Amino acid sequence: MSGFWESCLQRFEQELPAQQFNTWIKPLRLEGESTALEDGLRLIAPNGFILKWVRDRYLTRIEDYSRTFFEGPVTIALVIGSGKATAARIQATTTDSGQNAPANPATTSEKRTAASEKARGKGSNYEKSRLFPSFTFDNLVVGKANDLARAAAVQVANNPGGAYNPLFIYGGAGLGKTHLIHAIGNTIATENPEKIVRYVHAEDYYSDVVRAYQQKSFDSFKRTYRSLDVLLLDDVQFFNGKNRSQEEFFFLFNALIEARKQIIITCDTYPKDINGLDDRLVTRFDWGLTVQIEPPELEMRVAILKKKAEAEGIQLDDEVAFFIAKHLRSNVRELEGALKKVLAYSSFHGRVIALDLAKEALKDVIGSVRNVGMDNIQKTVADYYKIKVAELFSKKRTRAIARPRQVAMWLCREVTSHSFPEIGDAFGGRDHTTVIHAVKTIDSLRIKENELNHDLHVLLQVLKG
């Protein structure tokens, strides 16, 4: 029977993105490999959250594969690992390695000091770059939400001035745009120490323009910026209404591009949607490649929490990571804040980080997160698309009704913890396979259709208040 599970793992590893496979399938184990086949198979999940997720999304595929492998139907039971085993694992983690003990501030400080010393060793150009040495590609968690942006960023870092110039990265606050452009800068500075790389926030650029105007030092200002090999401009939306800054940046942009110097820009919205921005700049931002970073999906949120905890010298238990990730969905900054609160609570009270402690530490934070129900989602979607709520439950299949219905189902899956069957019941008693199809359809279309992706973004913001 171990041959079956090994084959099953290989198949899932080929079919699923690495993060989904590592989060949901890899932690499962087959119990009782010597048990007679007629007694069925028992798959052990490490906790209830993984069990529910696998049961809703993957169990049917496992059952289908078992029928093919064993050439007949096989009963598969999905259960949580015994409490004894779980307790032993937690005890071993806390007593043997100390990884789940309260954070040691000295450890984090030492890591940051080491990173700074390494950065200083890169030369005087790096000293003036204003880059954060701790933001690298190695410690950037990658998922569906940012995989395209990361791929483009790596291309630019490996071939500055040649690929995707300018690179325009947009997305909401706290999604990792700043981390990504610092990672580009750090890679270029490390591999090309002779290049002059500079990170500049849009407000700092504005301040430099004002200072040059007041001191009548525009020649020096222009020389400084035009000497750059790589310009990383963060939060360009702050140029709104700052006409002189926009004019100076327009000429700087032209000069750098003409000299085949690399420009990377971040913003909280798509270039054409930036308020108060000169049309000439909008046009030039479209010369290169524009990529979006979206809010992280559940697997990515879990991976981010574990990575951040690891950086603090903590091995975060799965149940704690899933609990935080399930309730806080907006952005990376929100996750980091919640994790810091849990670590501080653990340190202050001298308690091991476990699910009950996380619930205590975050009761105010999670209590303030708006509780969105499926009925609220249905009403919001119906209002947005100007249809009746009853039409979402109907048998109508016209595009004007079917697409909003699929969007509503996708939102129910994204925003609530309801299973596919529960969502199907809420939409006129539809089968769970209909919901699965709707979710997959929207996931696929949102990558290709900017208008649909915009609709989803707006609806999510409305629902999350």
Swiss-Prot record:
Its main location: cytoplasm. One of its GO terms (molecular function) is lipid binding. Residues 93-108 have a biased composition (Polar residues). It holds the Pfam family Bac_DnaA_C. Residues 347-465 are annotated as: Domain IV, binds dsDNA. It is found in: Cytoplasm. Domain I is involved in oligomerization and binding regulators, domain II is flexibile and of varying length in different bacteria, domain III forms the AAA+ region, while domain IV binds dsDNA. This is Chromosomal replication initiator protein DnaA. It comes from Dechloromonas aromatica (strain RCB).
